[in-house]
Amino acid sequence: MLKDTRESCRLTCQVPPLSVDFAKRNLMLRTSVTPEGRFRVGIHTPSYQVSNLRENDHLGSLGTLPDQTVVDNRENFPDGDIRVEKARPIYEILNPLPFRGCTYIDSEWAAARAADPGLIKMDRPGPVSLRAILGTHCPAATIREIVTQLPLPLRYELAATSTDAEELVWLAESCCRMVCTDDGVPVGLQYNESNGRRQAMIDNFELFETIGNNPHLPDQYKKIMVLRPGVQGNSEIVGDFRQGATEIFEYLRSNSYIPWGHYAANFAPTSIRYGIADLSPLDIEGLRHLYYQRVFITVAEKLGIGPAIRRRPLTPAELETLRQEILGALAVDNQLESLATLWGWNFGYDFSGSGYRLHASHQMIHQQYAMVPQWVDDTCGGQNEAYSSGDLIADLIDRYRQDYHSDLFTDYLAALAHNTRTDGGGGEQSLVVWQDRNVLLFVPKAQVSQWELQLLVIADYAGGPVGNIIEADAAVRRSLDMGILKAQQILAGLGATMVSSIEYSKRLGVANGQRLLYAFLPKLPWSMGAFSEAQGRFILGHYPEDFAVACRRQLR
C-alpha cells in the first residue's frame, strides 16, 4: 500500500540528471520516472537579455483612472534592450509515459491554489430561462414565437444551457415532427421513407441532439428523441443488464469507425442517467458487466470454449468461471492472436452557438468498447501490427528495462509512494486520492488535462501484474468499477461536466510487467487545447499535490 511520505527533497535531488549527447543523438528515455523510485522534476528560472529591434514608438492613451489621470502605454515601448532577471519558476515535468509529452506548471498561478486548494473548482451555472425574461417584457402569446425564431446560434446556446423545461419543449417541437396523443403527449417521432430507408423528420439534427442531451428536458421527450431503442438507428441490441432500478442495453455498432465493430452500453429509457450524481454503484456494475462479458465471450469463442448461453446475461459466478477457463486455455496452448481490449467513456455533451460540437457523447452516460486484433492486412499484401494505445506502454516497458535495467511500474509505484512536493515546499506531499488492496486512484505527477486522474491496478495474479481485464479476478474488477465511479464523482464534485475516460491495456498472452491503467481527462472551459497541447506541452496552474487535496476533499 502506498503511504503519504514527507521525505526530504534532498532525496529527490539525488536523482541523476538526464544524460544527453546531442552530437551522437544518444538521449536517455524521456520519462520522469527513475530507477531510484523518484520523479525527475525540472525548474526554469532564467535570466536573459532581449535585443530591442523596434524602429517606431506608438505611444497613446489607454484611458483614465478615477481621478482622470491618464493611463498610457509607454511601458510597451522601452528605449533600450530588455533584461529579465530570474523569471518566476516554471516547473517542467516529463510525463511518466513519454508518448504523452511534458507538463509545465506556472509557479505564480499555482501559488494561490497551494495556499487554498479549494480554489480548484468550477462554479455550477445558475438557472437560465429566456422565457422568464421575455415574460417581463412581452405578451405571453408572443414569447414562444420569439424563442423558436431566434437566430440559430442563439437557439443552439439556449438548447445547451436552458434550465426551463417549457422552453426546451418549445425548441424540441420546433425542430422535429412528433406523434402526439389527443391530449398532446408526445409518444414518438414522425418518419419519412425513401428507397426503403426510414428517417425521422428532423429539421436540424444538431439542435435536436443538443436539446435531447439537456438534462432539464422532460423525460418523455428524452425517451422519444434519444433514448428509445431504434431512435438513433438500427444497431442491434445483443446484451442487457437489468437489476433493481438499473437497466442497460448493449448495442452492436457493426459498421463502425472501429474495425471489427464496437459495442455501446447505453442506459434504457427506464433508467435515465444524465448526470454523475444519478449514477449508483449498481449502474457502474451493470455498465462494466456488459464490457467484461462481451470481452470474455469473444475471447472464449476464439479459443473454442465459448459457453452455449444465449438470450440471457452471464451471472457474476459464470463470468468468473469463464475467465478462469480462458486463462487455463491460454496457459496450455497459447495459439490465439494477441488481442487487446479497447474501452472508453465520453461523459457529457455541449454544443456552442458557433456550431462547434464540444464533446462526443450523444447520450449523457454510455460506455463503448471493442477488441483490437493483433494484425492488420497491408494494402501491398503483407501484414502490419494493429494499433492499440496499450502497446505504447508495452514499448515503453521494454525501452525502460533496456535503458535502466529496471521495471517501469515497480519504479513508478515507488515514485508515487515517495513523492515530494513539486515546489519543494512543506505542504501536502501525496498524489494518492483513494485506494484499496487492488487499485490506486491518483493524480499524475504530470497531468495532460488540468484535472486528470488515473486509476492503476496494483494487484497481481498468478502470472504477474494484472495488465488487462482477462487477468483481473472478480475482486479486482469490483475495485476497478468502484475506482471509476469515484473518479467521476470527484471530478463532477469539482464542477467538471465533460470527461473523456480511456483504458491502456496489455495484449493477451504477453508477460511484460504491464499494469492495467485508466486515465480520466476532463475538458475545462479555459483549457480546450491549442498549439501547446498539439506539441505535447501541457500548461497547468496548480501543483499536482494540491489537486490531490482538492480531490480527497470530495470523498468526505
Tell where the protein language model's regions lie, with residue ranges:
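HIT superfamily nucleotide-processing domains
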Residues: 1-556
